[in-house]
Amino acid sequence: MFVNLYGPTEITCNCTYHILNPERDYAAGIPIGIPFPNEDVFLLDGENRKITEPETVGELCVRGTALALGYYRNPEQNAAHFVQNPLNPNYPERIYRTGDLARYDEAGLLVFSGRKDFQIKYMGHRIELEEIEREMAAIDGVERCCCLFDEKRSRLKGFYVGTVEKETLHAAMRRKLPEYMIPGILRQVETMP
């Protein structure tokens, strides 16, 4: 049996798990799964509202018995990450804001979506470049890839090493991603550092 575990150090190890099913296709990624019984794991949007609908990305937050007391002699980081639960105004209850982004899939399993501090804002949407790269990398014929945001020109650029034609790659990405997440420029390159 293989199990995918997720958990930052601040939770003193793991807070979610997913038992891999050998019959399932994990081409789109392996979920981080469901919380352990002693943890409550949930997603918050930018307005501190709980996210429950599938495919909506939010910050992964944790509360429970394994939550650390905080960072040693680092009050700034404590104030940013070990905070009062915004969903509970009735009594003191600390949560840990991981800075990780996640979403629920259609089966209700958590799926890691990247880091909050690598987000950009483009066409009115918050975008995780890693998410675009993950979808691009899953397309047949793509060996390596990266996505960059050109702030000066305000556009997304995708670079890839592989055998797939640009038009085929663009069409495949349009089937997997919303229009605002499709790089305006796709460039095939020989090598990538």
How would you label these PLM feature ranges?
Residues 3-11:
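Adenylate-forming
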